[in-house]
């Protein structure tokens, strides 16, 4: 008998890689943009994924949209407290119901686009949490090691 098809994980269910389907899709889009620009792909750092998820959840829970968290402080504070070392770092935030809407919004903003295409960044973590006024919160954390 033919093997049963493997069901696709729901967007909020982590796969074997530890990433949700939404998170993997966002990372794929980021790395496609980088490839088009002749840049190396970003490696996934699961510690950054954890922080990015915490940030997205915090924005929904506390009903804000800002790089400065009332709970955690700046993204750089979050990274330091987690013991993550870096030469350079950045954060992108988006509120959108789909990965394509979130990605398009970020790419159409010069500052966010600059983070995605920053040649000094080597690693990324993406955290997507469904809910809130936008349908989902998307946090991208970047570091250059």
Question: Where in this protein do the model-derived segments appear?
Answer:
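Short glycine-/small-residue-rich flexible loop motifs, especially phosphate/cofactor-binding loops
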Residues: 31, 76, 113
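Loop/turn elements at helix/coil->beta-strand transitions in domains of secreted/extracellular proteins
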Residues: 35-37, 84, 89, 121-124, ...
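Disulfide-stabilized extracellular recognition modules
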Residues: 95-145
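A generic, residue-level signal for flexible/boundary positions that often mark functional hotspots
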Residues: 33-38, 42, 59, 87, ...
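N-terminal targeting leaders of exported, membrane, and organelle-targeted proteins
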Residues: 1-54, 64, 129-145
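Short, surface-exposed glycine/acidic/tryptophan-bearing loops
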Residues: 49-99, 103, 116-118
């Amino acid at each position: 008998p033919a093997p049963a098809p493997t069901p696709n994980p729901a967007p909020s269910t982590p796969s074997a890689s530890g990433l949700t389907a939404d998170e993997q899709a966002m990372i794929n889009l980021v790395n496609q943009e980088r490839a088009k620009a002749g840049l190396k792909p970003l490696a996934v750092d699961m510690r950054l994924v954890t922080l990015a998820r915490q940030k997205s959840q915090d924005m929904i829970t506390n009903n804000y949209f800002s790089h400065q968290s009332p709970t955690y402080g700046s993204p750089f504070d979050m990274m330091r407290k987690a013991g993550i070392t870096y030469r350079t770092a950045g954060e992108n935030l988006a509120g959108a119901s789909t990965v394509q809407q979130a990605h398009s919004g970020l790419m159409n903003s010069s500052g966010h686009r600059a983070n995605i295409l920053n040649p000094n960044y080597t690693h990324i973590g993406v955290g997507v949490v469904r809910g809130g006024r936008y349908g989902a919160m998307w946090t991208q954390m970047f570091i250059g090691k």
